[in-house]
Swiss-Prot record:
It comes from the Eukaryota. GO terms for molecular function: protein phosphatase inhibitor activity. The keyword Secreted does not apply. This is Protein phosphatase inhibitor 2 family member C. Residues 12-17, 43-55 are annotated as: Required for binding PPP1CC. One of its GO terms (biological process) is regulation of signal transduction. Signal peptide: none annotated. The gene is PPP1R2C. Residues 147-150 are annotated as: Required for binding PPP1CC catalytic center, displacing metal ions and inhibition of PPP1CC catalytic activity. Functions as a protein phosphatase inhibitor. It inhibits activity of the catalytic subunit of PP1 and weakly inhibits the activity of myosin-associated phosphates. Residues 1-51, 70-114, 165-205 are annotated as: Disordered. Pfam families: IPP-2.
Length: 205
């Protein structure tokens, strides 16, 4: 009985077999007509988490949009009271005539001076940025040299420590001979008062 049921089941694997998936859908469709629509609906409802995460746009991200840092443009403010105000402005321009042209020339000159100042400020900013980069590079090279010299410094420190230990060992070897002579002299000096003290004590009783 188990052999007959295992022969009807398709072999499950990672890759889909086109013939087995088609036959299983066909057999399930024959069993119930509504199941085909359910299967299609279920397939369409599958979510791909990686695509959701890739297309999800958080509100805090600005997506590196450029921000315009341009100076405001100069313009003439007109009132929207009607045609009379426009005629008044036109009339004033015709009356002023030369003054208006001079004002426009002055506005153009001020725009040009703003552009020159902006270019100068950009140049100053670029110079400052260049100096900052050069300073960072110089500091990096100094730190790198110090780092690479660290191995040599460690070797030198070990050599100095070895020399200090050797000199201390040499001093210790010389000291025991001197201390042995001092100890014998000190013992002799201590023995002399002790023997005299013993004699005085023996006389008293």
């Amino acid at each position: 009985m188990s052999a007959s049921t295992s022969s009807h089941r398709p072999i499950k694997g990672i890759l889909k077999n086109k013939s087995s998936s088609g036959s299983s859908v066909a057999t399930s469709g024959q069993q119930s007509g509504g199941n085909i629509q359910d299967v299609k609906r279920k397939k369409s409802q599958k979510w791909d988490e990686s695509s959701i995460l890739a297309t999800h746009r958080a509100t805090y991200r600005d997506y590196d949009l450029m921000k315009a840092n341009e100076p405001g443009t100069s313009y003439m403010n007109l009132q929207d009271d009607g045609e009379d105000s426009v005629r008044d402005v036109e009339g004033e321009d015709s009356v002023r005539g030369v003054e208006g042209k001079e004002a426009m020339a002055a506005t153009d000159a001020s725009d040009h001076s703003c552009e020159v100042e902006e270019e100068e400020s950009n140049e100053a900013y670029m110079r400052k940025l260049l100096l900052h980069k050069q300073e960072k590079k110089r500091q990096f090279e100094i730190r790198r040299r110090l780092h690479y010299n660290e191995e040599l410094n460690i070797k030198l420190a070990r050599q100095l420590m070895w020399n200090d230990l050797q000199s201390e060992d040499d001093e210790n070897e010389e000291r025991p001979q001197a201390t042995n002579e001092e100890k014998t002299a000190a013992e002799e000096s201590e023995e002399a008062p002790l023997s005299g003290g013993l004699q005085t004590q023996s006389c008293d009783p």
